[in-house]
Every structure is written in structure tokens, then in C-alpha cells.
Amino acid sequence: MPKRTDINTILIIGAGPIVIGQACEFDYSGAQACKALREEGYKVVLVNSNPATIMTDPDMADVTYIEPIEWRTVEKIIEKERPDAILPTMGGQTALNCALDLSKNGVLKKYNVELIGAKEDAIDKAEDRGRFKEAMEKIGLSTPKSFVCHTLEEAWAAQSEVGFPTLIRPSFTMGGSGGGIAYNKDEFYAICERGFDASPTHELLIEQSVLGWKEYEMEVVRDKADNCIIVCSIENFDPMGVHTGDSITVAPAQTLTDKEYQIMRNASIAVLREIGVDTGGSNVQFAINPENGEMIVIEMNPRVSRSSALASKATGFPIAKVAAKLAVGYTLNELRNDITGGLIPASFEPSIDYVVTKVPRFAFEKFPQADDRLTTQMKSVGEVMAMGRTFQESLQKALRGLETGICGFNLMSEEPEKIRQELGNPGPIRILYVADAFGAGFTLDEVHHYSKIDPWFLIQIQDLVLEELALEKRTLDDLDYAELRRLKRKGFSDKRIAQLTKSAESAVRNKRVSLNLHPVYKRVDTCAGEFTSDTAYLYSTYEEECESRPSDKKKIMILGGGPNRIGQGIEFDYCCVHASLALREAGFETIMVNCNPETVSTDFDTSDRLYFEPLTLEDVLEIIHVEKPHGVIVHYGGQTPLKLANDLHANGVNIIGTSADSIDAAEDRERFQQILHKLHLKQPTNRTARNAEEAVKLAEEVGYPLVVRPSYVLGGRAMQIVYNVDELQRYMREAVSVSNDSPILLDHFLNNAIEVDVDCICDGAEVVIGGIMQHIEQAGIHSGDSACSLPPYSLSQEVQDEIRRQTAEMAFALGVKGLMNVQFAVQDGVIYVLEVNPRASRTVPFVSKATGRPLAKIAARVMAGESLKAQGIQGEVIPPFYSVKEAVFPFIKFPGVDTVLGPEMRSTGEVMGVGTTFAEAFLKAQLGANERIPKTGKVFLSVNDADKPRLLPIARQLQESGYGLCATLGTAKFLREHGVAVQIINKVREGRPNIVDAIKNGEIAMVINTVSGLAETVTDGHAIRRSALQQKVFLQTTLAGAEALAGSVEYLADSEVYSLQDLHQRLL
């Protein structure tokens, strides 16, 4: 049946900020859905609070709202836009929960809006653990023995039925939030309490453990005529007990017999029918008992998910696009398969003639206090995918694509005890310990016994380890063409061969080139080569025939950002996509290189050609060897491609835009100082120390407080602010190893300075300022973690003009061609330069949305040789409204981690709020970050002595807005002396009931708590902040943030919703 004509306007709900468990895969699905529905002539209205997404670009939907995804706000949008239908399956758990809220609160009924893609009942049946279990029983499928509970008493009674270890799963959450595995009574109670808090329906499933069973997923698409296809089967390398988002996964499934596969295929289709998903994609998870083959259903997601993004990239079948079209009435046989140029219908099940491996990327180095053991609660922040002709090849490519410094099975430990521990209690790099076990002489049975990983996978790794052990006894000269080719076919990188044969990577590359041994490139075509494909979606392998068929057009290659991690996320992918779009418009053929399956940049139609490859020097040079591009852009993917700039340059690659030398001048401390000196610009006093004694001596010259950091940071405990010599010595002892090669940098810390971020574009002849952002949190907090306002909300015009002048001078002095970001600190009217990055920064998408000017596109054309003047870009756009960017943090996933912000970045994502005043924009940004700000209630205040005078006006303002105040003794005494009525409450160590009790009992509406020194944070403050986080109480740990909050609460009652298109209209 063709599409529906009874609906005209469709509202798509996005996923909001990037958090653990919900990353940029939903930008990919949402962007596809917008394109698909507009193609069909529908009017598309979009709501998403995340400005760093492609889907919120003003030309993706007809009307775009960057507003909080919360049912009251969405109701205002529905009232204004009057959509006929809502598509809630493209925005992860956030969108599903919002759609259910709209239904429960009568909004859908009131405005006569229907849900398409998944009905209320289907969502509820899949997400409500109790109903799902009943539905499975009805169709004769087993689920683990389990009980639905709503109180701790019920949960404990259920536990005695299922025994330890016990699985605890909250309802209506994603990424396993709040859940876990309990091995004893104490852990059980702790996880249950956390789980009840996490579940919006206060409901848990207490489940029998199937730890050690094999885990599989099926990606299913169904249409309303009941046609079903399996897009992809996925097998988890890690057995049950590790969240699938934290598991290494392989597609297609490797260890199922054909009969088992057919049984699972039929079961997954039956699940969709019973749940009632009648249009679109779902994923169904199964577990199989390796002892006897018993199969059970674990859960299903009635929406596109992280796995469906992976399945789309693994097969080339665009699940989200197809699901969007099915939701408006099409059937699978009416849709064509794009990748084959429409030769076959979408009802053909994809078949693949290669192996895909996904490996998760973790960020535990940012959270040293976090527990890095993997359980049913997801902890990874990103992932990398690789393709090869064999599992071994794709696994080795994925490992080197992670960018964690490994290029193969690098040795972690030779201690049998340590290895046993790591095999049985998985952490982020268990696979390397599997290799170590074989290296240390463990048998296959022993490794299987401890790890429960399927023997088929273990044999593959054992074989690679034996290859490595043999290679260590040889030299590079010993290897002939046949042996080198055999190693390359198993996925060994030049770098790993060099390490094992004790030679240089360049020597291995030169030998390979002299033997004319290069990879060939194969196409991803959904049909295993059965039909021809014009789509250049390619991966490398060492075989005979190359399918790349490069053109002789003028082309530019863009290097992407690799796996998401903290500090390098979706913002950089956004810039890469924009570069590709702009250069295509300018008439170039564009080539994208990236290995992140979640992103829009790795969509097969974003660029003319896509190479799904790791971003290492070897892999990039091989693609350049085949494609011979006119130029390469390294400035848009964050640190990943930037690190390759010098080596690419040395290998004769033409880097367009800002040169490798200019990048180095900005990054090299001493060269940069000389430039600032020449321009008469100020920097905070700084010194470089090469040993501990020197550091203590130089610290006196610089003056405390200091920001200390190693000059060469490899993750790790990078930066700290130290207030005295004891803290400095402790940092030197514990955090860093200092030497001549890796000195330590000491900067004077500007206390209570205002930090300012500037993005600009320079074409060599002129500089155009993109935007000036004033940070809300004081300097010393990482710019990626601080909220910021565009335009600035309290900087004087003189200071802003001087910042503009200094920015332009530095851009010219560095010879920038393209984007540049500068961070300044302003203290008592004096401007200091903190750092300069001659590349795309993480604020580019935010500035582009706030000013209506697509900076990344403009700069890409500058890099390709088109001046700003020729593009008609002149002067700065200063909007007549305020935009505030706020950071979103993953603290709730890491019990034990303090929420205090510092110079080390820890946020995973961002949101944006827009308002006619700074206060309105700030409030909307807080709501967008899922903060609950009540209109009434008690505010708890506890600040250090230095902050007390600044607290006074805040306390008065909150009181005038109708809040009650309570404080610890010192703060209360100060406020009372100045005539503010406040109730006194005990500190944690002053007896019960204390502040933590009050927070847990729901008596506190908001907490304002600043830190003093290091010792106190460990005890009182930490307990207060942690309990506020767990009880979802709004928490401010900086006074600047508290000031902004106090000024904005008046907007709680009523704030407007503004569409991006209307805002940009005002700028003309």
C-alpha cells in the first residue's frame, strides 16, 4: 500500500544530549527519518535539545525546536504546530518515555495526535518488564525466571526464589541504567535502591542469573502487511553478564548452527508480532545455554537502537530510513534498496560476505574512582567498527581503531593470578588478557573456564598469539612476500609487525611497498556481490581483486574523529559532515574516512565515497595511495587526525587549510610564547619543570594557586589545580612521571576569572568572528564542562572589542586558513590568552545554531581556496537573543565519583537553551539537561568562607522567589548576621538527622555547595553531592552557576518555545 494521505505534519522527537547508553546513533537515525519523510512530501517538525546534531540543522526539518525534551515543553510545540502524528522511535529511550508521558497526560487526546512507528500499547508491552514476560509466555518462548517488584520487601522475597547471583533490571531505562548483578545481600539492597530511583515507574525485575550464556541479537524490520526481514544477526563475544553496549560484538553471528539460526529468526519475528510492532525496526536479544542449547528471550527494543545503527553500517541497509517510510504506510516490497541503485526491493534480506567487529571505547581514565568492572549497566562512551574478510582481520583492525595506544595484542600482564582475575571479572580490555593467558601458557579449556567466552573465538585469538610468539623470534629481513601477506590477511598492522620484529614502522611499510604488497578495497553492497553497486562504501582487505574504481575528479579527503570519547564527541563528526556537504556543493568529490558506526559521517550517502577504516597512518596512507586526493582535511575530527598531520606531511600528503607547521606553532608551548610576545599579548605566568625539585622552585616564581599538567598527555590524570607546596609534591608523587622528555607545565591559576571562548574563520586576508561565548563557571573548569552564553551576558563592550582584536592578530600571526578557537580569561578587566587551537572546536555546532551561520561549511570552502569575500561572508552576527550551552555528565553511572568540576573534562554531551533574556536561556538549558528545578521548596546552602559574601545576593533572590533556605552552621551564621532568615541543618559528621538524611527524605529542592580545598571534598561535600545526584536533586557546585540559577527561576512558570527557523529569520 502506498503512503498515507490522511496525515500532513509529523513531529519527530530526538534523543537529546549524548549520555552513556544513548550516543550519536540517534542523530544518525533522526537525520535519516527527517530526510525520508520530507522526500515523501510531509511537513516535518523536530524537537531535540542537542545542538551538536546534524538533525537540528535548520534545513533538515521544516520546523526545528532546540528545546527540552520534556512533555510540558513538547505540549507547547504541539499546540503551536498541530502535528497529525508523532514518530517516537527515532530518539531512543528519551523519545519513547516522552511519548508515553504525552499519552498519559492526555496531550495526544487533547490535540488529536496519533503515534506512528510504535503504538502506546506496543511500547508499554515491550518496556514494562512484567507485561513483556507474560507476552513471551503466551507465544511459548522462555524468559529467565523473574519477578516484577515495586518495593524492597517484594524484591527480597523474589530474590530467595531466583538465588544468587541475581540480576536487577529497572523498567523504562536504557543502557541498563540503575541495574546490576548482586552476589550478596548488601549488594542486592544497594542495587535495588539505585534501580528504584532510576526507573520512572519505580519498578524492578528481579531475575535469575544466566551469566556465562551466549548472547545474540536479531535486527528485525516488519511492515504492516506482516512482511518481516532480518537485517542482521549479531553475536556477543562477551557472554551474558556484560551489557551488550559494553561487549565486543560480531556480525553475522559466528557460532550458531543453521538450525539454531532459523529457530532464533522465527522467534524474533514472533516477538515483534506479539508485542505489536507493526511498522519499523526492533532488536530482540536472546541467550543460549552453551551446555544444552536452551534458548531464552532477554528483552526487545521497539525502536531503532544502538544495535540497529551498527546493523545499518554493517550491512548497508538503512534501517532508520526504511522504518520511517514504513511508519507512514509503505510496505517493504514498495521500497527500493538505495545502495544497489534501486535494483532490488527493500524486502530482500541483506547478505554479507565479510565479518564485522565492534569494540567499545571506555573513558575510565577520566574517572579514577569509578569501578571499571563491566556488568549489566553500560559504561562505555563510544565504539569502533571494522570490517575484514575474517574475524581475525576485522578484530585486529577494530583494536587499532580504538586509539588507546594499542596496535594489536599488546602485552598487559604476565602474572597468572592477575590474568585469572581479569578473565573472570571482565574489565574494559579483557580481550588483551585473553591473549596474555595464551602467551603465558594457559590451555584453551582454562581460558574458557575462567572467561566463559565461546571456544571458537578463543581459538581465533590463540592462533594470533602463536603468530606473535613466532614473529618475536624473527627479524624483518626474514619475512618474504608470502609470509608478510599471510600476516596482513590476519589483520596485523605494520606497527605491530615492527614491534614484534624490533624494527621501525616505516621500515615495515617500505618493505611492503617495495614488494608491491597493498590492500585491495571491497564494497559493502547488501547483497554479497550478487548485483552491481555504484555506491562507494569500502573496506580494506588483502585479496586479489580491488573494487574501489577511483575517479579522476578533483577530490578532497576528510579524516573523521574515530570512536566517541569524553573530550572528542559528536561535535567533531558534525564538522566533518558539514565539510563534506560544503565541498560537494563546491564541485569536489568528497572522500570520508572514519570507523565510528554511530555517526552521520559514516552514512553511505553523506560523502561521494566512504572508507570504513581505522584512522591510523598506515590505513590512511593506503587509501591516499589508491585515491590520490587533491588535498586532505585533518582539522575537523578533533585530536585523532590532527595527530597524523606531521606524519602525513612528511609522506608528501597535501594538507589543505592551516599547515602542519602552524598547528605545531600553536601546540608547542615555547613557539607559541614567542608569537604572543611579539604581539604584546598576555599569558598567565608559566614555567616548565623537568624534575620534582625544579617544580617546587619554579612554583614559587609563578605563585600559587597553580594549574599543573604533563606536557604530553596520554589520557590519565592529566590536570589539577594545586593550592600549596604539599599538594604540588603529592601530585608529582602520584599523578605523573616527570622527565626531560615529558616535562611538567606550571601555569598561574587565575582565581575567579571569567573564561571566554571565541570561534573564528580566517582566510589569510580577513578574519570573521563566529561568536564570543562567555563561560558561566569560572576559569579552571574545563571549557567542555562549563556552560556558556552567546552573546556574553556580563562582559563590557571594551573587553569584547579587545578580544576581537587579539583573536584576529593571532589568526594572522599563525597563518590560519580555516577555523580557529581561542580561550581567554578575563580578570579585573585584564585579558589573558589561555590557549589557541587552529582547528574546529567543540563549540562550532553551538555557535552555528546560535548565529545561523554554518561555520564548518564556510571554513571548508576557505580551506579549498574560496575567500570569505567571495562567499559573501562579512562581519560578525550578534543575535538579538541569548543561547546557552550546558554540559551533561555521566556521574550517575559511576558511584564513588565526585561531581565537582575541574580542569579535566568529564561531560559526555551538551544541550542548548534559547531565550529573549540570558536568564530564560539558562533555565531552558538546565531543563534540557534533564535537571529538575522545582518552583517551591527548600534550598540547601553550604559554601566555603571565600564565597560567603557572593552568596548573600543569591540567598536573597531565592528567598524573594518563594524558596525556603537551610544551611550548615557557618553559612547560616553569616546569612543571619546579614538579615537573611535561614534554618540550620547538621553536617554529615555533626549527628543525625543531617543534610544527607534531608536530601534522601525529599525535603530539599536544590543544593548549592562549593568546595574548599582538597581534604573536605572527600568527606562531607562528597556525601552531599552524591546523595543529591542519586535523588535527582538539582545541584550547583559553582557560585557563578548559582547566580545564573537565582536569576532564572522566575521563568519556571512560563517560558516560550522558539523554532530555529524563526530565530534565524530575526538575524536577517
Curated annotation (Swiss-Prot):
Residues 549-930 are annotated as: Carbamoyl phosphate synthetic domain. The keyword Ribosomal protein does not apply. It catalyses: hydrogencarbonate + L-glutamine + 2 ATP + H2O = carbamoyl phosphate + L-glutamate + 2 ADP + phosphate + 2 H(+). GO terms for cellular component: cytoplasm. This is Carbamoyl phosphate synthase large chain. InterPro entries: ATP-grasp, CarbamoylP_synth_lsu, CarbamoylP_synth_lsu_oligo, CarbamoylP_synth_lsu_oligo_sf, CbamoylP_synth_lsu-like_ATP-bd, CbamoylP_synth_lsu_CPSase_dom, MGS-like_dom, MGS-like_dom_sf. Mg(2+) 4 binds at residues 835, 837. Its cofactor is Mg(2+); Mn(2+). The keyword DNA-binding does not apply. The gene is carB.
